[in-house]
Design a protein with these regions (language model features):
Chain A
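A short, Lys/Arg-rich alpha-helix, primarily the initiator
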Residues: 1-27, 72
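Short, charged recognition helix plus adjacent turn
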Residues: 4, 75-87
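Residues within the helices of the helix-turn-helix
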Residues: 22, 31-32, 61
DNA sequence: TATAGGCCGAATAAAAATACCGGTATAGTT
DNA sequence: AACTATACCGGTATTTTTATTCGGCCTATA
């Protein structure tokens, strides 16, 4: 009936996404990239550190545009192992 | 100091994303696609109708995977005109 | 009848996104 | 040495939004 809490797997997934975004930022400062992507530096920092585990689609899209990385690439890399549910 | 309300532009952007996802779903039922993507049917319906304007990145990623569409494609199409800020 | 698909509104807990504060560490300047 | 500026981190507080379930309602079709 309510929104369920994030699972440990979802937390991990968010951390991995953050690591990739941080790596893509390279030597640029958080302030510069966040401003270019139209978000606050605090938000970008929390995404990079995984404290925002399930950020909004358009937030990541804006970041990917600024950082010149592919959204599909990010999604695939962040969700590595599909549970492979048996039929 | 607080999270600002969604702008009309963000609402529109969400609606456009919904339209694209709906089109990609084709003849498949909401229940089938939502289940395959690991979310409730109600949530998918709200995304398609734009009532969830800024869905989570991994939510859209799961949908894009099931529907076999590109996240980059969705992002570009949903945010068509960059404001073209003058230098 | 009844079954399947879809639409809508209310209610709820959890989380996003933001700002502010202090702390740390490094690099450059006076 | 003292000061200044930049950059990053962690916590707190706040409002808005997500994601979910439930119930009802409608339409087509077997």
């Amino acid at each position: 009936m309510v929104r369920p809490p994030l699972t440990p797997e979802e937390r991990l997934r968010g951390e991995q996404l953050g690591v990739m975004l941080r790596q893509a930022r390279g030597a640029r400062s958080i302030v510069e990239v966040a401003t270019a992507a139209g978000m606050s530096a605090e938000t970008l920092r929390k995404i990079e550190t995984g404290r925002i585990a399930t950020p909004a689609f358009f937030t990541i899209a804006a970041l990917a545009d600024v950082l010149d990385v592919s959204l599909d690439h990010l999604a695939v890399r962040a969700v590595p192992a599909t549970p492979a549910m048996p039929t």
